[in-house]
């Protein structure tokens, strides 16, 4: 076997080790167009979640002078967004210029039509089993699968000879080849565990019951010291080899009883299949500092201090090694020791799978600016703040550092003059808004007057930093550049969680085993430990998964479908939609939903069959409840959101959830839509437009 082939197969194993299948992103057919310089250049700066109401307020107060200047000289509008107003959906429409029915991204989550179980969208993790030689060496690649349809406008531009740079734009992982261009992947680029961000937390004051994975993701580990020394570890990816062995034993278990030896091995695999990095901690109580050793790297950190990026090597076996990196933060080192670590980012110096195109683009960037965060959601402390393991101050410090990383990447690439199209995105505006909306909304259940006095300006500060970046970019742009600033959606307070599955149970659309009527107490139906446990699919007509999506248990689509296509489907759509639209908040009789949309009214295209049958549109203040997003059933239909994640936009009615659009050019269109940007940019660059765009060029 050739060396290049072996390397390719090892890469396949690595991809499975981090939980990502090789994915073929749709591409337009190649044509032989040489590189060319366009008469016009276009620079697009995206700020995830920048809200038009807050932007207008801050501009009126004189706090965003650069955006105000851009608005005065050119155009400022609210930018219409997608159904639903979620980042992956909207950014996919931004890239392709089409509605979700043509690009196939409808939510952060998708459901398995056989098992009904939810999984992350955007990257399809399914693949054929990894074939191994001698149980060690991979000898066959997983099958490439596609998740997103449509063609990114930068791909179309590249095929016409346009030179481009695309930097950390959401829904650009796996990275796609761009002719005459360079692309650095963004969301959903995972950590080395294959998740969007598993944080680590070690503490002496954790109980044994708290150890493990909490509700919002992460890994908590109790520290026990002997003579001032504690031996622990940083949890890594699952070994693809041991994972396959476990899968084989489980498959055998379904058809026949396992031997005593096989059962013992299956039990053992649960504890040993993760590939971990050992950590030694030396600490004296009340010393105010701690010493760590991580694979030869020695750290001495004081309370409140961050480490630099620490390299990590996960040894899957003698052939497969995964290279990552993390940062440690000592939250306490007094009477208790509390240590946080970032998710294990792929090391851009030697990423286990491609995170950029060309592949070396990511590595070459390190030589110019040093190491940088690679995970798609660069602001990694939202989950630990949700779990009350870290505080607001450390979150904001880290968010600022994440912004630094993205900004350095932008300006390093601006040093080159070899581009006609430049597209970059920063998501810090979104992450800060999610976590701090409670401190600008006195009616929020988690509003805290003292915290508001300290951090009530957190959202304003990140908007002002975005404005400063806009000004610095403008100073460096060539004169013939159209400059656009945009966001994918706006923001709202999230005071109340709405449990759609609870409503479906209460009204008889979802039924559990042994449930005689929908009015039977829900106490018996919750807390069973697994999603859909006990659901009677022979009597269930509808179920909710994700952030506002309702699916019917449809014959010929779901594995145990009972709803017939045609008249029965149409009647059920109207029945549930009309009933939900009338629902009022039991606390204050406020209207919960602004609208409930039927599938065929909002989507069209070749992926229509994958769309939800109903999509809800919430009024301000409401969002799907936390457990409901993954198919859980709670005791009450509406409940307070008692979480620090207090601002949101997911499934808020599109009519009130638009983003922002600024342009250095005058635009006559009073109601631009995010789907309009792809054809607008291509027209400015002189690239022929495809026929299937849903958006129209803005003029």
Task: Enumerate the predicted regions with their spans.
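N-terminal Sec-pathway targeting helices
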Residues: 1-14
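A long, amphipathic alpha-helix that forms part
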Residues: 23, 35-37, 55, 396-417, ...
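Generic recognition of well-ordered alpha-helical segments
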Residues: 66, 93, 575, 579, ...
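Low-complexity, glycine/alanine/valine/leucine- and proline-rich hydrophobic stretches
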Residues: 622-669
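Juxtamembrane extramembrane loops of integral membrane proteins
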Residues: 40-42, 49-54
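Second-shell loop/turn segments in exported
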Residues: 53-57, 80, 141-143, 667-668
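Hydrophobic alpha-helical membrane-insertion segments, chiefly the h-region
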Residues: 14-25
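Secreted, luminal/periplasmic, and some membrane-associated catalytic domains
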Residues: 36-40, 47, 62, 72, ...
